[in-house]
């Protein structure tokens, strides 16, 4: 591919779908703190004045779902009815059942190492050397824009900002290399007291310029800041939100394939989540080791079966050693059974609420972002 454009988007923690994701993962974390072996599939729906939390949970833990929900909304910043949503006054409904025993009998085993996959499915992981976090640049910078929006909202730099926001960044490439940013879109909810020209200038100076590298911005770069002219009604008052509806934002911004399974609200026995994390871990270590510049991993599973039904590795012609060597290195050095994924990445910890906004990948605080297999891979491939 010669010259081309590629675009990715992100949304803020105050976006309705992300509110739902964060509530689902906050419930998961609270349960895992008490019962690491719990089975959790927690879904959330939010709309004006109400939250519904439902799903299937089997656990010895007791958690206060209403208080967890309110505290999560409070932390995001919806604490005033003028915003259309208020953590202190919204209704919280709960509809929780237990995991089906038909599923459970296929997952749990006498030998925990033979833990079966919680469902069938396909999962992808990806890494690229175009950023320092080995992620595609468009989604990386889209996340950073809405993270910056939240920061200047919460620290009072721009006190008229409100929690809901979206970003979109279009990068220009030539022969696979970034040559600049073609377009930037940032839409942010705001109070009724701010004029559009003032908002646009403040967003440019306090959000966009501090985030996007100056060398990629040119006089041809197009900026669209609140292009509708008004964004006062937002959050759950503007749109309903559902868990699992931002799966491309959560992953690679469309730069890699996606198996279709969402992450939030699912315990690590669900390979939709744990295997996607493991696939990212494997791909990132391959790229960090220098064995390829780009790497995509596909894993697949059958419900109740421990071993993956397939492993596929694609390096897009960027491999520096034989493709067969890379495949052998992965098969012989990574345990990709559900138990192996959980042990390898220490996934029974209550770490998931932090993942539920601004992307699950490219953030060094998460264990699947470690590059601790680099030397092993280089030694195996005899690559120095």
Swiss-Prot record:
Q: Which GO terms describe its cellular component?
A: cytoplasm
Pathway listed: Amino-acid biosynthesis; S-adenosyl-L-methionine biosynthesis; S-adenosyl-L-methionine from L-methionine: step 1/1
Residues given in the record as Mg(2+) binding sites: 17
Q: Could you say which residues bind L-methionine here?
A: 56, 99, 239, 270
Question: Which annotated residues bind K(+)?
Answer: 43
InterPro entries reported for this sequence: ADOMET_SYNTHASE_CS, S-AdoMet_synt_C, S-AdoMet_synt_central, S-AdoMet_synt_N, S-AdoMet_synthetase, S-AdoMet_synthetase_sfam
Q: What class of enzyme is it?
A: transferase
User: Bound how, and how many: what does the cofactor note say?
Assistant: Binds 2 divalent ions per subunit.
Which of UniProt's keywords are assigned here? ATP-binding, Cytoplasm, Magnesium, Metal-binding, Nucleotide-binding, One-carbon metabolism, Potassium, Transferase
Q: Which family does it belong to?
A: Belongs to the AdoMet synthase family.
Protein name as it appears in the record: S-adenosylmethionine synthase
């Amino acid at each position: 591919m010669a010259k081309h454009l590629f675009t990715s988007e992100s949304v803020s923690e105050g976006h309705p779908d992300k509110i739902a994701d964060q509530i689902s993962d906050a419930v998961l974390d609270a349960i895992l703190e008490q019962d690491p072996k719990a089975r959790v599939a927690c879904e959330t729906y939010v709309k004006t004045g109400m939250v519904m939390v439902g799903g299937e949970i089997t656990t010895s833990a007791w958690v206060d779902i209403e208080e967890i929900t309110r505290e999560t909304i409070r932390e995001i910043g919806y604490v005033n009815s003028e915003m259309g949503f208020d953590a202190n006054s919204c209704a919280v409904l709960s509809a929780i059942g237990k995991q089906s025993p038909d599923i459970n009998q296929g997952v749990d085993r006498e030998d925990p190492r033979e833990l079966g996959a919680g469902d069938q499915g396909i999962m992808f992981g990806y890494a690229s050397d175009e950023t320092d976090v080995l992620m595609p640049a468009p989604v990386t910078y889209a996340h950073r824009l809405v993270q910056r929006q939240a920061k200047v909202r919460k620290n009072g730099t721009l006190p008229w900002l409100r929690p809901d926001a979206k970003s979109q960044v279009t990068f220009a490439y030539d022969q696979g290399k970034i040559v600049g940013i073609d377009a930037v879109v940032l839409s942010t909810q705001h109070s009724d007291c701010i004029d559009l020209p003032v908002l646009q200038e403040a967003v440019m100076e306090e959000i966009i310029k501090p985030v996007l590298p100056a060398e990629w911005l040119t006089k041809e770069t197009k900026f669209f800041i609140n292009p509708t002219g008004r964004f006062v009604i937002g959050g759950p008052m503007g749109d309903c939100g559902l868990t699992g509806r931002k799966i491309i934002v959560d992953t690679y911004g469309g730069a890699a394939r996606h198996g279709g399974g969402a992450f939030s609200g699912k315990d690590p026995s669900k390979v939709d989540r744990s295997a996607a994390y493991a696939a990212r871990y494997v791909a990132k270590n391959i790229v960090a080791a220098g064995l390829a510049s780009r790497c995509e991993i596909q894993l697949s599973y059958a419900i109740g079966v421990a071993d993956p039904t397939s492993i596929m590795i694609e390096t897009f012609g960027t491999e520096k050693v034989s493709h067969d060597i890379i495949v052998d290195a992965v098969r012989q050095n990574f345990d990709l059974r559900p138990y192996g994924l959980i042990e390898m990445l220490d996934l029974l910890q209550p770490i998931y609420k932090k993942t539920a906004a601004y992307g699950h990948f490219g953030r060094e605080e998460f264990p699947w972002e470690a590059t601790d297999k680099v030397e092993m891979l280089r030694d195996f491939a005899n690559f120095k």
